[in-house]
Amino acid sequence: EVKLVESGGGLVQPGGSLSLSCATSGFTFIDYYMSWFRQPPGKALEWLGLIRNKGNGYTMEYSASLKGRFTISRDNSQSIVYLHMNTLTAEDSATYYCARVDYGTNYDYWGQGTTLTVSSAKTTAPSVYPLAPVCGDTTGSSVTLGCLVKGYFPEPVTLTWNSGSLSSGVHTFPAVLQSDLYTLSSSVTVTSSTWPSQSITCNVAHPASSTKVDKKIEPRGPTIKPCPPCKCPAPNS
């Protein structure tokens, strides 16, 4: 099985340097070109460059937009390809991907990506808030639970439900950046017979701050239901 796994992302100060790595397995590494891409938040995928195979002398080619700041190298004994980056700016903030080149511009295998944030802002751990409906509002056949992850920096956080065992009915919304802090939310819809009789937990990890938080979704309430409308007595005839 072919695998590509990137690592090395994180928070870097403007003007700093960083090297990303892409560990590969499942194929004869020296026979293939390897390429790097990046995708800034809300923007298109951008090709950065490639390093050719043994038959082509392991030569490199780069996007002109990089202006010589990035270098690609490979360790053939370890089947790893690297991306070395210098003089980083906020515009370099992106998720970086490595890809195997099948032929020409056909990329047949990709990694999952590693995120780089270039900023002078400080690392901040998230606050995690479980969101549950008020008792009495779960009379239908399904119920939607939520999890709010607020005030963290930098990206990314990972959010799962029941440590990943609950994946059906999950909707995780894109993170929003405001005042140098991110906010992210996720919801999961389950049957009313599942919750609250069974435990449901929101699991959040923020690698940059080494934070892991598990929040069990507890029912809110009990609440006082309003009285039925009063009925006026019929007037005396």
UniProtKB/Swiss-Prot annotation:
UniProt-recorded Gene Ontology molecular function terms: antigen binding
Subcellular location: Secreted
Region: JH2 segment, residue numbers: 106-120
Assigned GO CC terms: extracellular region; immunoglobulin complex
Disulphide bridges: 22-98, 147-202
PROSITE patterns listed in its UniProt record: IG_LIKE
Chief place where the protein resides: secreted
Keyword field: Adaptive immunity, Disulfide bond, Immunity, Immunoglobulin, Repeat, Secreted
CDD domains the record matches: IgC1_CH1_IgEG, IgV_H
Domain Ig-like stretches: 1-119, 126-218
InterPro entries in the record: Ig-like_dom, Ig-like_dom_sf, Ig-like_fold, Ig_C1-set, Ig_sub, Ig_V-set, IgHV
GO annotation terms (biological process): immunoglobulin mediated immune response
Xref: Pfam families: C1-set (PF07654), V-set (PF07686)
Segments for region (D segment): 101-105
Role played: Anti-influenza H3N2 neuraminidase antibody.
Protein name as annotated: Ig heavy chain Mem5
